[in-house]
Design a protein with these regions (language model features):
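Intrinsically disordered, low-complexity N-terminal segments that are enriched in acidic
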Residues: 1-117
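Short hairpin/turn module used for nucleic-acid contact or packing/dimerization
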Residues: 13, 277-319
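A short, structural micro-pattern
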Residues: 18, 33, 50, 84-88, ...
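A structural signal for short, well-ordered beta-strand segments
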Residues: 22-24, 92-94, 164, 242, ...
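Short beta-strand segments enriched in hydrophobic/aromatic residues
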Residues: 28, 96, 246, 300-302
């Protein structure tokens, strides 16, 4: 592994095309009379990501459903199932095309200039919102100390972000099941372990601790099996990373879990201030059931040969 801040230059990739299938199945030990759900499972249409098709299906068929766009521009789907059921399945299928990382962004004056110049002071309110701490507060003394080691005076923003990405990847252990959705950043900092959404939230707390604007991004990561092994359908998972704002309304996305800048292997679904703004699926049920089980299957399948051949990466088990 390279020393912090000394990574090799990013090599331009090629356009990738994927078929993404995300299936969530709930089973209950008693009949559910009514289920309400809201999900963020539709990839965003972006300048570097084109959504060729996307649909969300629910079984049993909902009695009521609608789609909309939230305050951050994310597509969401709402549904209400009133048919009595003991299992509920939500499946999202999309075909997306993703461009390589923008070399112009990496070579921009903002990316190569002092990080202090990327603070959003005096800019529009929506951007400033991403620089504010959450409630309850996530910026602790430990976060400030960790961020101060990275964001030294006058350091180029890109260099600092690459260093932060590498430090989190090095200092924290990826351990599936070690945290829950409700786990606080302070706990992750103390334990030095977690999964992708934890590492993204640590990165965001560090950005905000020094006055930078950062957003939480949910999506998928195309993964490759070990050499000699066949690709297992459904073995992928939801993923999460962070992005920092640059003047000119541009964002530089980075993936601490895999120690890399976000590129054509990442499929962006939604973004917000934190995980709570964009959970893949959230809902309420009415039942006498005392227990339930959730099974999640995610498959990010390359549609053409050019989309395979990427090194093994880690995605999260956050559902």
């Amino acid at each position: 592994m390279s020393a912090p801040g000394q990574h090799s230059p990013v090599v331009a990739g090629t356009v990738r095309r994927y078929r993404v299938t995300h299936t969530t199945r709930y089973t209950y030990d008693d009949v559910v009379s009514s289920s309400y759900g809201r999900c963020y499972l539709t990839p965003r249409a972006l300048s570097d990501q084109r959504v060729e098709s996307s649909q969300v299906s629910v079984d049993p068929e909902p009695d009521d459903r609608s789609t909309g766009v939230d305050v951050y521009g994310n597509s969401d789907t709402y549904f209400h199932v009133r048919t009595p059921h003991d299992a509920l399945t939500v499946t999202a299928e999309s075909v997306v095309e993703v461009d390589p990382i923008d070399q112009g962004l990496l070579l921009s004056a903002a990316a190569l200039g002092p990080w202090e110049e990327c603070r959003p002071a005096g800019t529009s309110a929506p951007v400033v919102e991403f620089a504010m701490d959450l409630y309850p507060a996530e910026i602790t003394d430990a976060v400030r100390e960790y961020a101060a080691e990275v964001f030294t005076p006058g350091r180029p923003l890109l260099e600092a972000i690459v260093d932060l990405t590498n430090r989190i990847n090095t200092d924290f252990t990826y351990r599936s099941g070690s945290t829950a959705i409700s786990t606080r950043v302070a706990t992750v900092m103390a334990r030095r372990e977690g999964v992708c959404q934890d590492f993204a939230r640590v990165a965001l707390a560090c950005l905000r601790a020094v006055g930078l604007a950062g957003r939480y991004v949910s999506g998928y990561l195309a993964t490759e099996p070990p050499p000699g092994r066949e690709r297992v359908v459904g073995a992928d998972a939801s993923h999460a990373w962070a992005a920092v704002w640059l003047p000119g309304e541009r964002w530089l996305a980075f993936d601490p879990t895999n120690d890399k800048l976000v590129d054509e292997r990442h499929v962006t679904v939604a973004w917000g201030r934190d995980y709570d703004d964009v959970p893949p699926l959230r809902g309420v049920i009415y039942t006498e059931s005392s227990s339930s089980r959730i099974e999640v299957s995610v498959d990010v399948a390359p549609i053409d040969p050019a989309a395979s051949g990427n090194p093994a990466n880690r995605a999260s088990d956050a559902h």
